[in-house]
Every structure is written in C-alpha cells, then in structure tokens.
Amino acid sequence: VVLTDCGTGIVHSVMRPTLQRANGLVIVSGGSVDEARLASETLTWLEANGYGDLVRNAVVALNTATQATQLVKLDEIEQHFKTRVRQVVRIPYDPSLAAGSVIKWDQLKKQTRTAARLLAAHVVDGLAVAE
C-alpha cells in the first residue's frame, strides 16, 4: 500500500501517472457546503478525464474538522457522495485533528480512532487483488 497526499493539485503533471497506477482513492471533504462542492468537482474532473472507475471505487472521508461543522447538513452532503462513490466515512470533530499538527493516535478520541479504522477497512476492501 502506497499513500500519497496530492493536496489540491489534481491537474499537476505528476497526477496523471499517479492516477494511472492507483487502485483506490480517498477524497477528503470538509463538512461545509463549499468544501463538499470542491470535493464533488474533483470527482467530476476525475470522471471527465477517464478515471470513472476510480471514482466509483473511491471512499470519501467527510471530515468534520470544526465544531461548527455540526451546524451544516451533513446528512445531505453524505447522501450526495453516496451516489458517486463506494463508501463515505464521517470523521468526527476531534481537537487533536483540528490542531493541524502531528497526529498522535493515542491522543485521538475513541470515536475518531473508530472512524479512522473504518476508513482504513473500506480502503482495503476496495483494493484490487493481484492475480
């Protein structure tokens, strides 16, 4: 398993060869409508550029990075992504993640660790089996 954080540079020249070799994608979306729109536009770009199979097999991590995220319509955002990708996992608000620094597993809340394990399980479930 190789992980790469491509940030927002989906059109960067290194992305095409990276996507051609990928078995799966995790698309991270914030919980706001604007953040969800950007993540959805990324999925649309991928589909329009020949990566529809990757989109259908993708997992969206719906990151509720701030306490205010609870005020938005997370259920509607989640339902939108469920029509486009294989799985959606909500990552709950956690002050350790919100700090934006090094993540220390043992300092995460139990529900955050559970969500991270679920995310990892969904990613592994979608990996192609070598024949």
For every predicted segment, state its role:
Residues 1-14:
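Switch II (G3) loop of P-loop NTPases
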Residues 30, 45-50, 80, 125-131:
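Cytoplasmic membrane-interface segments at the C-terminal ends of transmembrane helices
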Residues 40-57, 77-78:
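Conserved C-terminal guanine-recognition region of P-loop GTPase G domains, centered on the G4
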